[in-house]
Every structure is written in C-alpha cells, then in structure tokens.
C-alpha cells in the first residue's frame, strides 16, 4: 500500500472537488478500471452509491469512462456497500463499484471496487488500475461501447438476502427497535428488513437530502439513538453508518454496545450452535476485554492491522469465518464477503430472541477497558511516528502503564491523521498518557 498514489485502505477517497475526487479523475478511473477488468467475463459493472449529493456527478463520470473502455454499467441507486458486494456476485458482474466515503461528512466521497466474487480487489489489480491511469485515454470502436441500465429491484433483492440470514424458526414479534440509518444508504433497506421480520420499528436518520449523511447521527454518533431508545422504551437501538457496513447498538437502558461487544455476542452464539469455524479476528484497536472474554470461552483470537480488508485477509489466511473491528465493521464470511451492518445486527437480534435475553445481558460479558483515542491532523513531511522525540515519549508511557494497558500509534489509511490510542483499566491514566503522546506528535507536526 505504501507505493500507491490513489488507492488507500478503502479505495480512493477525499474531499469532493479536490483531486482526485473530481469528475475528470472519475472519468479516467472508470476508463482505467474498465481496461483492466474487461479481459473476460460479463462486460458489466454494478455501480452503487450512498446518499451524498456528489454521488450523481461521480456515477455519471464513472459510467462514461467504463463505456469508453467497452464495459456496461448497471446502476442500483443508493445502496449499502455490502449490498453491492452481494449483488455483484448474484448478477455475475465483472466488478462492483461503490461511491461512498462511509462514515465521513457529505463533502467527502470515495470510490471503491469489489471483485466478481464480492471481495475487495486484490492489490495487484489496484496496482494495474493505477498504472493504467498513467496512460493516455482512448475509446473502443463505437460498436463495442458500453451501455447504461438501471436495476430496479436491487433493494428488494438485498432485503430478501438479509432476511434469509435470520433463523427461520425465530421472529421479532414483540420487539420494539429504533433504527438510525445515518441519512445514508440503508434508509430504505433496514427498516423494511426488521418490519418484515415482525418488529415494531421506529425510524430516525431516514430522510437523506444529500447533505445530512452522518450528521449527528448513525454509527459515529449514537447520542440521538440513545435518547430515542430511552424515550420510546424500546428493546434495542441499531445505528448504521452512511454506507451500511458498520453497526453500533444501544441497549434498552441507553448504553452503547460497540463492535467488540457485538463481535463477542456473535462469536459466543456461533460457538454454542457449533457454527464457529476456528477463531475470531480483531484488530490492533480491539479492546483487551474482548480478547480476555474470548479466551475464557476457549476461542482463539488474532489481531490484524486496522481496516476491514486486513481483517478479511487474516480470516482467509486462517480459514476462519468471523472477524471485525470495534468501529462496527463485522464480517461474517459464511453470510457475506464484507462487513455488513444489517446482517451483523440480525445475528445479535437472533441471539436475543433465541435465549430471551436483553442486549444488556448479552453484552455484559465484555467489560470494556477505558480506551482514549486522539486524532492529530498530519500535514505531511516527516512522519511524526518516526521521530525520536515521539518514540521516547511513547516508550516512557509504556513503562508507566506497566502491563495495565497498552498504546497504539498509527497513521490513518484513509485520512491525513495520526491516531493515538491508549487503553488502560485506569481511565484517568489512559487520558493523561494519550494527551502526552498527542502533544509530542503535534510538536513534530
């Protein structure tokens, strides 16, 4: 990934109107991807997007580039990222493209690709696309140009897929569920999934206008969801991010249940039913309490680098089927090929219904250690993490923690940030240590 010019850990991403998230680059990217992907197969690429206003501009440019390379485009309209992964497989498309910046504000956007198998593109394919971007753009003969079409039943297909992951002998009758769709791609999907399974659904964050995606709502800000769950005396709250590949939950008392706790609930239920294959993959950011709780069940646990693509890579390396991040990316590989917020939340609801336990009771096995995360904007130049001054402060902090906690310093793969994380059973000590390291990073920056 270090030598990439455009592709980060989750495709190409940035501020709309600033290179490379511009219409001219999207046109060239569509063409370059089309040239690389057109060697065989259906000659058709699915294009989905979230609800950002810039999605219209970018999908048109991508379609024109693909057509010039001889590939046809099939538009799904606003659709969760995991839906595109699923639909790419079922339509036997050459590839799938998602126009989204996930949990970022509306003024950011991104373009990411799925292979014909519904997985992130291999590194060598992304590298080939980057190499093609350096070539002058051409156009196939008129008779070979791609066409554009629309898939009108994409939402219905994905709704049925999601419902099919829920055990047939269970239902959600009697459950009151608040669903926050972040004014994003799940707004017309998630409420219907849970209603059709029998639940009473209360919606928030389901009125997208192109500018309000992830704005004080969704998986990155569950404050409104917590208030609505308590106000309506709901059994559970579900919060998805803008493109629907993350899930955060809220119990009936208004407590947040994060990705680590969700991952544990799903793992324990899979273990009980004999469906857990191998162990569980987390990340360097996974809370120590998750690892301890899984160890008590005898479940192996491995840490991958941060990013769902790295979680999936380690799952595939070990032939395991469950992994995720504390941010709410949960991959259940025997159900979908990427993080799927709706499918993951259905797995938790199935455990609640099966054992007649509340989310609070299910999540109580994982008592999260306080974790302090400080993001320091990185302007370029020397990487502060390579600085002797930062290394010295980090080493002193590690010594002070004396096995009671841990630190993690990393450069973001999707944003110009240095992430400082300190985890410790003593919350005050964690905060103090994180601030000391962040201050050292700022001085270098």
Swiss-Prot record:
The modification Phosphoserine is found at residue 102. Mg(2+) binds at residues 102, 241, 243, 245. The keyword Metal-binding applies. The keyword Coiled coil does not apply. It catalyses: alpha-D-glucosamine 1-phosphate = D-glucosamine 6-phosphate. Binds 1 Mg(2+) ion per subunit. Its EC number is 5.4.2.10. Its cofactor is Mg(2+). The active site is at 102 (phosphoserine intermediate). GO terms for molecular function: magnesium ion binding; phosphoglucosamine mutase activity; phosphomannomutase activity. Gene3D superfamilies: Alpha-D-Glucose-1,6-Bisphosphate, subunit A, domain 3, Alpha-D-phosphohexomutase, C-terminal domain. InterPro entries: A-D-PHexomutase_a/b/a-I, A-D-PHexomutase_a/b/a-I/II/III, A-D-PHexomutase_a/b/a-II, A-D-PHexomutase_a/b/a-III, A-D-PHexomutase_C, A-D-PHexomutase_C_sf, A-D-PHexomutase_CS, Alpha-D-phosphohexomutase_SF. Catalyzes the conversion of glucosamine-6-phosphate to glucosamine-1-phosphate. PANTHER family: PHOSPHOGLUCOMUTASE (ALPHA-D-GLUCOSE-1,6-BISPHOSPHATE-DEPENDENT), PHOSPHOHEXOSE MUTASE. This is Phosphoglucosamine mutase. It comes from Haemophilus influenzae (strain PittEE). The gene is glmM.
């Amino acid at each position: 990934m270090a030598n990439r010019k455009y592709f980060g850990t989750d495709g190409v991403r940035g501020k709309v109107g600033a290179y490379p998230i511009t219409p001219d680059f999207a046109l060239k990217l569509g063409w370059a991807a089309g040239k690389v992907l057109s060697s065989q197969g259906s000659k058709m690429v699915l294009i989905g997007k979230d609800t950002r206003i810039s999605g219209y501009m970018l999908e048109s440019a991508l379609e024109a580039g693909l057509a010039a390379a001889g590939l046809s485009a099939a538009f799904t309209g606003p659709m969760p990222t995991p839906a595109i992964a699923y639909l790419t497989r079922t339509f036997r498309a050459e590839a799938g493209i998602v126009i989204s910046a996930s949990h970022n504000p509306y003024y950011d956007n991104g373009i990411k690709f799925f292979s014909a198998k519904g997985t992130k593109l291999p590194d060598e394919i992304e590298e080939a696309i980057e190499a093609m971007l350096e070539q002058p753009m051409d156009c196939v003969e008129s008779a070979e140009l791609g066409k554009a079409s629309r898939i009108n039943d994409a939402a219905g297909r994905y709704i049925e897929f999601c419902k099919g992951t829920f055990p047939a002998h269970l239902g959600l009758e009697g459950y009151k569920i608040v669903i926050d769709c972040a004014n994003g791609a799940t707004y017309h999907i998630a409420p219907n999934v849970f209603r059709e399974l029998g639940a009473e659904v209360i919606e928030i964050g389901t009125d997208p206008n192109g500018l309000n995606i992830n704005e004080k709502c969704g998986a990155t800000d569950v404050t409104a969801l917590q208030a609505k769950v308590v106000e309506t005396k709901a059994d559970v709250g579900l919060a998805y991010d803008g493109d629907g590949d993350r899930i955060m939950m809220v119990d009936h008392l208004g407590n947040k249940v994060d990705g680590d706790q969700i991952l544990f609930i799903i793992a324990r239920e899979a273990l009980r039913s004999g469906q857990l294959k191998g162990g569980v993959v987390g990340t360097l950011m996974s809370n120590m309490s998750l690892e301890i709780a899984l160890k008590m069940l005898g479940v192996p646990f491995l840490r991958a680098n941060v990013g769902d693509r790295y979680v999936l890579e380690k799952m595939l390396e070990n032939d395991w089927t469950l992994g995720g991040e504390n941010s709410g990316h949960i991959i259940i590989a025997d159900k979908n090929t990427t993080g799927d917020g709706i499918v993951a939340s259905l797995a938790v609801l199935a455990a609640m219904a099966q054992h007649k336990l509340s989310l609070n009771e299910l999540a109580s096995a994982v008592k999260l250690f306080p974790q302090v995360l400080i993001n320091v904007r990185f302007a370029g130049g020397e990487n502060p993490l390579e600085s002797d001054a930062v290394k010295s402060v980090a080493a002193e902090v590690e010594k002070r923690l004396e096995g009671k906690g841990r630190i993690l310093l990393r450069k973001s793969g999707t944003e110009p940030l240095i992430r400082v994380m300190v985890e410790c059973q003593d919350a005050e000590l964690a905060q103090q240590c994180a601030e000391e390291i962040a201050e050292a990073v700022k001085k270098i920056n």
